[in-house]
From Swiss-Prot:
EC number: 6.1.1.5
Residue window of motif 'HIGH' region: 57-67
Keywords, alphabetical: Aminoacyl-tRNA synthetase, ATP-binding, Cytoplasm, Ligase, Metal-binding, Nucleotide-binding, Protein biosynthesis, Zinc
Similarity field: Belongs to the class-I aminoacyl-tRNA synthetase family. IleS type 1 subfamily.
Protein name: Isoleucine--tRNA ligase
PANTHER family referenced in this protein's UniProt entry, alphabetically: ISOLEUCINE--TRNA LIGASE, MITOCHONDRIAL (PTHR42765:SF1), SOLEUCYL-TRNA SYNTHETASE (PTHR42765)
Gene for this chain: ileS
One GO biological process term: isoleucyl-tRNA aminoacylation
Binding-site residues for L-isoleucyl-5'-AMP, renumbered to this chain: 551
Keyword ATP-binding included in the entry's annotation: yes
Binding site for Zn(2+): 885, 888, 905, 908
UniProt-listed SUPFAM superfamilies: Anticodon-binding domain of a subclass of class I aminoacyl-tRNA synthetases (SSF47323), Nucleotidylyl transferase (SSF52374), ValRS/IleRS/LeuRS editing domain (SSF50677)
Cofactor binding remark: Binds 1 zinc ion per subunit.
Predominant cellular place of this UniProt entry's protein: cytoplasm
Length: 921
């Protein structure tokens, strides 16, 4: 007879196959129809506020896997905090100004770009940015990220631009903004100044030359310098020595050369000089004020002192050109040296460079070297591969060039020290982030905030045509900000000066009305760095300072730092209470993603092939505080992990199809094994909550997966299967298990909800109506950890039983391999327990209970047994005694004792006698 209809087999419409690629868009549509973001916010009205402020991605191209990682991490935090009872708004934003967009637009326009007005270029840039905001918005939504997508913040929005100008105005009024001629990074290809955050370092092959400068007063004496930038020699005005180093006067043939003693041997070897003699040694300070002759310009080169001169390379005599170097410039200020920078915006030498006028600086290198060789000033040459700054956008090498620019003085009003103090008050995850940004802020130069481009917020500066004064006045900025709020910044390039200036405004220096607007724009890091003012302070649903900023580790010198300096400079405090940093993404071998290696992974491809849920699981499984690895192989591993999670959720649902929360059994009446499972669940809730609080999502993932695989699938669910399927449908034994399964399902689904946002919603829809308080799981309350369920003696006892079970499972596996048994229920095991502790525990339970624990038909105990030699017991496996029950498949010598049910064991007979009305027999 087929007894299938008398068993409580799992039943659920929750499918085994996830079909994520089809189901996820359907879920997105449901969320859209219910206006998910508004619904969640309405249900958290009046709750404590938690503000994660979105660092704006750049509106240029499709999202890549790094952008996806960032947005998914933010979504984990927002969804967890919401379920924790917080009102956690999420206003996504986009960085929409700047060189990358202008560069793309110019590339598309080709030669035509040069003929167009700035106003026209700006309109095309806006259109380009708008296009990619729309594209990226859909791509982020596809990842399951919840946010106010209909009302994002955009840095080209007039109100946002006006807020940025207000930040600038405050800094101008406090005296933190100045204009000067100073060497800065300059991209000759993009024709603009660059900030440190816009420079990338790549390996670059450079000249390495040694040049002698003749002493003007002692014609046979020479200062020997070393440089890797021959093109900067036309701007040389000095040679720097360290006042504290010893310098040797060395005889080489008939000449006396001056070099640092600590570099003498190394330098002579590099120059190929084998024969030389040290004549005398002096401190560097003794040479101060001496004068050398420039090797090819009709100009003096003064000997100056500088503490930064080091003994790591070169000669200890450092070629100094204040127009082409930050340290050189500082030395030039101290010695009042001229700042010469004979290079135009395109990197072409001007007539000030003499015979090299008209040459591109890097093209001039070999010519200058050859001229030095011919004149006899070149005493050594070679090539060196070293780390050199390149433009972040066009990837070409940049130069250091002195130009007139606007700067934020990071030391005025103790801005640097205040920023360092705020860094100390901020919580950094991981903790090394604090040291990293501290070092960067300590060592950073003043911030060059002007750019010579079109697409950005104009700096509302004017130049007086009568006295030449550059004017950047807080009153003028405030007036212009008022216009911008209504009209946007395009008006700067379209309106006349009289329309842009406050009525009756005159030059503060000479009183002239003859003022001409300047066309520099603000560094985009000022745009995005002002978001604390333009978004966090302005929006009613947010609060300043924000609780969390989370971005990639490159933002220590980017958005974290620009936001910090601007906020401290205008508000006196950091814009964030804590900062989370994530690493970069590499391939499986730890190599950087690149087109040339063909190892880039496209998030859209993963979404379309496997579903966004798999990408989200990959993010959760990765320790994002380090560099993270991804490949299709790694994605396949996450597909397997997803299946394990989904199958467990499905199994739980299947065994609860006839259960309602009102059927629950009180804790005191639960079976002991069920109490153990509840305890394990609550330990998981405790640990997972702690990991979410610390933003350690990979530990959340590991803990949940271990719980599912080890505690549930391999142990608890395996053991209770018999009780669930075979005991009476409404029996206390089965209801005890179901009570626990229900609590596990609800709590587990909630703990997974921030990560598996689509799957948890699908599970939620399959829960009994009484267990669903909202239209979405995203508003449910986080599972509550209950200390009273933690019983250390119970845990200790069961740990020993589990250890014994491991020995039995190994013995059963051997018996199965030897074809002694097929299913474990075919077995009877006899145990010789070695451990007195375990023996005492086992004796407290019935043999039937222990047999159920091992999933065998019978258990016996003996003083001496021959069999598998386990760690805790010797285990002998035999064929079970008696006949197989056709309902539960256990063997019993009493099977068939009831003539009415001749192929059933007494337990199954009793179940059907008592609960027969529950089944269709």
């Amino acid at each position: 007879m087929d007894y299938k209809d008398t068993l409580n087999l799992p039943k659920t419409s929750f499918s085994m196959r996830a079909n994520l690629v089809r189901k996820e868009p359907e879920q997105l549509k449901k969320w859209e129809e219910m206006d998910l973001y508004k619904y969640v916010q309405k249900n958290r009205e009046g709750a404590p506020l938690f503000v994660l402020h979105d660092g704006p991605p750049y509106a240029n191209g499709n999202i890549h896997v790094g952008t996806a990682l960032n947005k998914i991490l933010k979504d984990f935090i927002i969804k967890y905090k919401t379920m924790q009872g917080y009102n956690a708004p999420y206003i996504p934003g986009w960085d929409t100004h700047g060189l990358p967009i202008e560069h793309r637009v110019a590339s598309e326009l080709g030669e035509k770009a040069k003929e167009l007005s700035k106003s026209t270029i700006r309109k095309k840039c806006r259109k380009y940015a708008e296009k990619y905001v729309k594209i990226q918005r859909e791509q982020f939504k596809r990842l399951g990220v919840r946010g106010d997508w209909e009302n994002p913040y955009l840095t080209f929005d007039p109100k946002y631009e006006a807020s940025v100008l207000k930040v600038l105005s405050k800094l101008v009024k406090s005296g933190n903004v100045y204009r000067t001629l100073k060497p800065i990074y300059w991209c000759t290809s993009c024709e603009t100044a660059l900030a440190e955050a816009e420079v990338e370092y790549h390996d670059h092959k450079s000249y390495s030359i040694y040049v002698k400068f003749q002493d003007k007063n002692k014609p046979n004496r020479f200062f020997v310098i070393w440089t890797t930038t021959p093109w900067t020699l036309p701007a040389n005005v000095a040679i720097a020595l360290n006042p504290n180093f010893d310098y040797c006067e060395v005889k080489v043939k008939d000449e006396i050369w001056i070099l640092a003693e600590g570099l003498l041997e190394q330098a002579m070897k590099a120059m190929g000089i084998e024969s030389y003699e040290i004549i005398s040694t002096k401190k560097g300070s003794e040479f101060e004020g001496e004068v050398a002759q420039h090797p090819f310009m009709n100009r003096d080169s003064v000997i100056v002192m500088a503490d930064y001169v080091a003994l790591d390379a070169g000669t200890g005599c450092v070629h100094t050109a204040p127009g082409h170097g930050e340290e050189d410039y500082g030395t030039g200020l101290r010695y009042r040296l001229p700042v010469i920078s004979p290079v135009n915006d395109q990197g072409i030498f001007t007539k000030e460079a003499g015979k090299y006028a008209g040459l591109f600086v890097f093209d001039a290198n070999p010519i200058i070297v050859e001229d030095l060789r011919k004149s006899g000033h070149l005493v050594g040459e070679g090539k060196i591969e070293h780390s050199y700054p390149h433009c972040w956008r066009c990837k070409n090498p940049v130069i250091f060039r002195a130009t007139e620019q606007w700067f934020i003085d990071v030391d005025k009003n103790d801005l640097r020290q205040k920023a360092l103090s705020e860094i100390e008050k901020t919580e950094w995850h991981p903790s090394w982030g604090q040291n990293r940004i501290t070092a960067m802020v300590q060592d950073r130069p003043d911030w060059c905030i002007s750019r010579q481009r079109s697409w950005g917020i104009p700096i509302p500066a004017f130049r007086c045509q009568d006295c030449g004064e550059s004017i950047l006045d807080g009153k003028v900025i405030d007036h212009f900000a008022g216009i911008v709020e209504e009209k946007g910044t395009d008006v700067w390039f379209e309106w006349s000066e009289s329309d842009l200036l406050p009525e009756g405004y005159t030059c503060p220096k000479c009183g002239s009305k003859n003022l001409k607007k300047q066309e520099d724009i603000l560094d985009v890091w000022v745009d995005s760095g002002s978001s604390f003012e333009a978004v966090v302070k302005v929006m009613d649903e947010l609060r300043f300072p924000a609780d969390v900023y989370i971005e990639g580790s490159d933002q220590h010198r980017g958005w974290f730092q620009s936001s910090l300096l601007l906020s401290v400079g205008t508000e006196g405090v950091a814009p964030f209470k804590s900062v989370i940093t994530h690493g970069f993404i590499n391939d499986e071998q730890g190599r950087k993603m690149s087109k040339s290696l063909g190892n880039a992974v496209d998030p859209q491809e993963i979404n379309n092939k496997y579903g966004a849920e798999i990408l989200r699981l990959w993010v959760a499984s990765s320790n994002y505080q380090e560099d993270i690895r991804i490949s299709m192989n790694i994605i396949q591993q996450q597909i397997e992990n997803y299946k394990k999670i989904r199958n467990t959720l499905r199994y739980l649902l299947g065994n609860l199809s006839d259960y309602s929360p009102q059927d629950s059994v009180p804790y005191e009446e639960l079976l002991e094994l069920d109490k153990w499972a509840i305890m394990k669940l609550h330990k998981l809730i405790r640990d997972v909550t702690r990991y979410y609080d610390r933003y350690e999502f990979y530990k959340v993932f590991q803990s949940i997966l271990k719980f599912i695989i080890t505690d549930m699938s391999a142990f608890y669910l395996d053991i209770i299967k018999d009780r669930l399927y075979v005991e009476g449908k409404t029996s206390p034994e089965r209801r005890s298990a179901q009570t626990v399964l229900f609590e596990i399902l609800v709590a587990l689904n909630k703990m997974l909800a921030p990560i598996l946002t689509f799957t948890s919603e699908e599970v939620y829809a399959h829960l009994p109506e009484a267990a669903r308080n909202y239209k979405t799981i995203q508003v449910e309350n986080w599972p509550e950890y209950k200390e009273e369920y933690i019983d250390s003696s119970l845990e200790e006892r069961w740990e020993k039983l589990i250890n014994l079970r491991e020995d039995v499972l190994k013995a059963l596996e051997i018996a199965r391999a030897e074809k002694l048994i097929g299913n474990s229920l075919d077995a009877k095991v006899t145990l010789q327990i070695r451990s007195k502790d375990i023996d005492e525990i086992v004796r407290q339970y019935s043999r039937e209970f222990i047999a159920d624990l091992f999933i065998v038909s019978q258990v016996e105990f003996a003083e001496s047994v021959e069999g598998f030699n386990g760690e805790y017991a010797v285990v002998k496996v035999d064929r079970a005694e008696g006949e197989k029950c056709q309902r539960c498949w256990k063997y019993s010598i009493e099977t068939g004792a009831d003539p009415e049910l001749p192929d059933m064991c007494p337990r199954c007979v009793a179940v059907l006698r008592k609960y027969g009305s529950d089944y269709e027999l």
